Amino acid sequence: MTKIYHFIGIKGSGMSALALMLHQMGHKVQGSDVDKYYFTQRGLEQAGIKILPFDAKNIQADYEIIAGNAFRPDNNVEIAYANEHGISYKRYHEFLGSFMRDFVSFGVAGAHGKTSTTGILSHVLSNITDTSYLIGDGTGRGSAGAKYFVFESDEYERHFMPYHPEYSIITNIDFDHPDYFTSLEDVFNAFNDYAKQITKGLFIYGEDEQLRRITSEAPIYYYGFEKGNDFVAHDLLRSTTGSTFKVSYRGQELGEFHIPTFGRHNIMNATAVIGLLYVSGFDLNLVREHLKTFAGVKRRFTEKVVNGTVIIDDFAHHPTEIIATLDAARQKYPSKEIVAIFQPHTFTRTIALLDEFADALNQADAVYLAQIYGSAREVDHGDVKVEDLAEKIVKRVQVVSVDNVSPLLDHDNAVYVFMGAGDIQTYEYSFERLLSNLTSNVQ
């Protein structure tokens, strides 16, 4: 009898990707979640994967049950039922830790850039050889015959500790998730523990002073722009069609590469992938060829045009990510005004990084702020308001509501960059509807 996988919280980005991967590998998959639409569910619907409302009746003793990390007996009827009846289940990261043992696995960790880098590595490697992968934008691909497995390795609550990949990239270390991590040193300790679990090769951004402290039994390869790294990206040419650059390895030239994405951070992401695939024995000519066709990942600098107005949707919700996204927008649209529409995500992060958010948003030409999107894990004690952030921004700034985004029309020759990890897309859709009243020409 074929095993049935049931996902509690199937619309989560990691969960939906895993569900898609298992489905493509020939397994029977279903899941449950809230009614609210999430961008991840489109892929599930296209695959014909059943999405059910939460209900204790969904839980059967003979199912392989995978539970999202946010769900507990006190907030989910399915978890409560499973606990009451002695029905076992695994958390996402627990399942993944055992699943990857059947593959040569490539992890991508880091405070920022995980999803984009996982996307680049998955795209290139799956075009070279049969590869299964999980990307944090909700994309998953499974193949029963795959030898290689690429996955995103999340540090939140140390979820990456069950993972023991052969190879891993670590893009950076930064203080984030202040609801869990107590300090930058706490974040470092988590990554350092993870690094000790890598068995064959660790690829680290060498210009991050925290990452330079990392130790591992596996060989460590540093990548970056500066000469002190093993893999060095140099002779950069950033244009409106993407980024071209050369890479050298310990003084040996590996050639020129092009990636049709924007921002210095994506050059680094690509360099990490080049280094990993070079060390693990893949043909760099094939790597070079497939980098050229990378089309990006969901909610990372995703563009559309409405009546000649460029709208960019991005998941950026940390100051470092905001800076990178605005840098990418200026690279592609150097002659346009860059208008940022940002929704802070979680009260704890907003309080902890209020000054840093203001500094990052000042990189835009004008800023619009949405109300803070609180996490289900926290309570709003009134300690911070979005107006507190607005007061610290020196550029033109205004707080807008989802019901009235008309102030955004006060710009000519502008690119609108919507950023956030909450429901910022509702503001984006509201703006698109406003523009559609002016025209029906949507590309």
UniProtKB/Swiss-Prot annotation:
What InterPro entries does the annotation carry? Mur-like_cat_sf (IPR036565), Mur_ligase_C (IPR004101), Mur_ligase_C_dom_sf (IPR036615), Mur_ligase_cen (IPR013221), Mur_ligase_N (IPR000713), MurCDEF_pg_biosynth (IPR050061), UDP-N-AcMur_Ala_ligase_MurC (IPR005758)
Tell me which residues bind ATP.
110-116
What are the subcellular locations of this protein?
Cytoplasm
Q: Name one GO biological process term.
A: cell wall organization
What is this enzyme's catalytic activity, as reactions? UDP-N-acetyl-alpha-D-muramate + L-alanine + ATP = UDP-N-acetyl-alpha-D-muramoyl-L-alanine + ADP + phosphate + H(+)
Single GO MF descriptor: UDP-N-acetylmuramate-L-alanine ligase activity
Q: Which UniProt keywords apply?
A: ATP-binding, Cell cycle, Cell division, Cell shape, Cell wall biogenesis/degradation, Cytoplasm, Ligase, Nucleotide-binding, Peptidoglycan synthesis
What is this protein for, i.e. what is its function? Answer: Cell wall formation.
User: What is the designated name of this protein?
Assistant: UDP-N-acetylmuramate--L-alanine ligase
Q: Which organism is it from?
A: Streptococcus gordonii (strain Challis / ATCC 35105 / BCRC 15272 / CH1 / DL1 / V288)
Which gene specifies this protein's sequence? murC
